[in-house]
């Protein structure tokens, strides 16, 4: 039987130089990457002044969501949704909202199949959540749609 030996076409020394070159290229490009990352961290929605309300049943504090210039600029290229709704400003860690996965910064736009345009309408719909059936809550997180089911 003839033994075959595997021959390397790239030596370890050459591979190491390629790794170093890649690391240097990434270090050189990192200022551009961090700028894009910083833009992604800017808020997409803010609270409309004097619009805060609370949903005691779900355990969230809401305000009417107002889209920012960042969202307007990123909506088309990043395929982000622009909707009216209620921005969650805080979540009680012991409430059903936190248990269901809602977090600060989420924008609720539909509850139980009904669109909500502001914090007052969202709080009313959230306070109707019952104990016998799940209620679907649609929301945006960083401009992307999600949904959860809540029940008392």
Description of each model-found segment:
Residues 1-14:
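N-terminal secretory signal peptides that target proteins for export/translocation
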Residues 37-86, 90, 128:
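PDZ/PDZ-like peptide-tail recognition elements
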Residues 90-94, 152:
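A structural micro-motif recognizing beta-strand termini
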